[in-house]
């Protein structure tokens, strides 16, 4: 996290790239301690979370990080992040046919994100 924060400081600094924090999006696969540490910084950047599944079983198959930081812990961290920063979160969701694009999963996402302003970016995956 120290390197990420140093990088953000450098690109934001007037003698660096002078990019405003509101123009920066920081993506994470869902490392909960990193999200909590970032919340403490109160930066005005956009946090983007690679969600890809709202349930632990599916997310563990798609994203091995879920075995270390379960999706329930991730949702809790995102709620804490919003409470601490007041910044909405962008949730990235690659839709995989028959894996994570079911109605019940959409309903579960809505339930888990209720009360937390955010944006769900649905990314349809195409057959190659």
Predicted stretch roles:
Residues 1-128:
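Conserved AdoMet/S-adenosylmethionine-binding subsite of the radical SAM
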